[in-house]
Every structure is written in structure tokens, then in C-alpha cells.
Amino acid sequence: MAAIQFRVRLVAAEGPILEEILDATYAIWSEGLTRDNYARWNAAQMRTAWGKDHLRRFALVDDRGRWVASAKRYLLPMRLDGVDGVMCGLGAVFTRREERGRGYAGEIINQLIDRSRGEGATVAGLFSEIGEELYRRLGFVTVPMDEVDIEVDRKHGAPAMLVRSGEERDLPALASMHTKRTEGVPLRFALRRDPALIEYALSKKRLLAGLGFGPGPRGARQTEFFVAEEGASAAAYVVLTVSAGGWTLEEAGDRDPAGARLGAILQVLLAREPSRPAPLIRAWWPRLMPVPPQLRLTNRIPARDIFMLRPIENVRIPDRADDVFYWRSDYF
């Protein structure tokens, strides 16, 4: 690896620099959007109530005023070993093509971690699409998580339960369900998901589906959010991404310790088209999340998107899937 040739400084990626970065990264992370809609999707995420305070894109700029690397930085509230803290989430790490092999990816990661330490972060995290080796050299450790297929019992038809579309007023109930599942249990790491963070995760997926609507398999992608009520509030819910390839269960919750209402929601949704074969349903299913009696988890494998953490302060990194509670919805 060649040494860094020029001094570099960390700046917010804005204006012409941001446009160049979007041009360079469009082919990798556009998710089937047009170039204009890729820019709109990124900008809209940062304008959400949660994103405007917790999400920024940065660039490394050299002495010539030229950007050489970029990354998104998220400040995510989390709990590690019973202590509330902040995770510096790192996403879309990218080095300008002609500058690769000079260590700029590691430099921007290290500078963002140093910056986040001053903002209260005790751990840094990322999802790797390029394997583990590069990030291991930078001090990251792989955190195991599971990916599963979900089979839903359809033998007895749909239960007599009202399922409706989720709304903004349901978000506090969703946050409460998550807190109940992740506090006071033998669990080492989980996000602290408040209504604003849940709304951000939903908005990100809805924006992607809306901006990408059109011909082609990705243009048929939809985000569906359903709840079952008890009284006047949500008692169980699911968030799904529906596409030509099947369903992805992005997140779910149930006030019922056994999860029976969650299972019933999925039965109701499948009963909308009773004559069609059940779609393939995939999920990251946290091991401490109860499996509803109507569901069966099969084909368990390590999650294909590799989750890695690096300590910033004196903390221990979880090393078992049993220790982590994390939904696909919070991928960054």
C-alpha cells in the first residue's frame, strides 16, 4: 500500500464535492434509482427528524482541494452491557478510484471515529460488503447475526383479527415493544430505538420504493407497515419490503410474550391471496425474539451483510449471535 501523499482534512460533503461523490458512488449504491432520484433519496434521509441531527456525509480533502474518500457517519443510540451510549455508524465508505491503495479508507474511518469520540461515541460499527479483512486491520471485530427463512402456517386460514396499515401515531408503541424486548434480558448489544429512529428507518425504505417505482424488478418494490390493535394502540406490527424476489421482514414486534399476534398478522397478509404460493420470506431474526407459534424459522445462516464493531472506549465487543438484538431495518 502506497503512503498518503498529501495532507488531508475532514469536511462535510456538500455542494460540488457532494455531487462528485454521488456521481462516483451511483453505480454501487443507487438501488436501481436514476441518478437524480439517487441524489433525492440521499438528501431526503438527511432531512428527516432523526437524520438531520444524526446523519452526515463527510469527505477527505487533500491539499489540492480535491476529495479523495467519503463516508456517511451515523450517531446511533445503543446499549452495550447495560450501559446507554452512542455508536458511530460508518456507511458508504468509498475511495476515489485513482486514489485507491493509499490508505484513505482507513484514514477517513479513523478521523470519523476520533470525531465521534468527542461526541460521546463508545463504539464504532459498520456493515461490510467486501469481507472482513480490511476492517479487521482497522480494529473491527465481526459480530455474528442470523439470517433465516420464515415459514408461516396456512393450514387453518387467516385468524379473525383486524390488521390495518401502520401510522405515525403507532411509533411510540413500536418503540415501547422494542424497549421491552431488549431491557432487563441477558443481552449485550441493541439499539435504543425511539420513535424518531423508527420513523427514519421507515422513511428510508418508503422513499426508496417511491423514487424507484417503475418498470423492472426493483421498480415493483414496496414497503408495507401493518399493525394489530388492542384498545386504541398497536399491540403487534410488521414492516416488510415486498419485491419480485419475495418478502423481507425488516422488523417486527409484539406485546404478547409469545408473539402470537405477530404470527397472526403474517397469516392475515398471506390470506390476501390464498391461491398463490407463499412468497420466500427472509429476515434477520434476533435470537432473543420469541418465534410465534404460527411460524417456523428455517435455513439459518450467518447474515450475508457482515456486522462489525470496534471499541472506541474501554468496552468489550459481543462475540455471539445470542448477545445481539438487531433488525434488518437498521442496516446502514
Show which residues each predicted segment covers:
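Amide-forming acyltransferase catalytic core, primarily the GNAT-like/NAT-type
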Residues: 141-251
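A short, well-structured alpha-helix characteristic of acyl/acetyltransferase catalytic modules
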Residues: 15-28, 168-184, 323-324
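Conserved GNAT acetyl-CoA-binding A-motif
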Residues: 109, 114-128, 274-286
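Active-site rim helix/loop that mediates acceptor-substrate recognition in acyltransferases
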Residues: 22-79, 188-223
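Active-site/acyl-donor-binding loops of N-acyltransferases
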Residues: 75, 133, 139-157, 241-332
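Conserved beta-strand in the GNAT
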Residues: 57-61, 66-76, 89, 94, ...
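Conserved N-terminal entry element of GNAT/NAT acetyltransferase domains
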Residues: 1-19, 152-168
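Conserved acetyl-CoA-binding loop-helix of GNAT-fold acetyltransferases
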Residues: 92-95, 101-114, 258-272
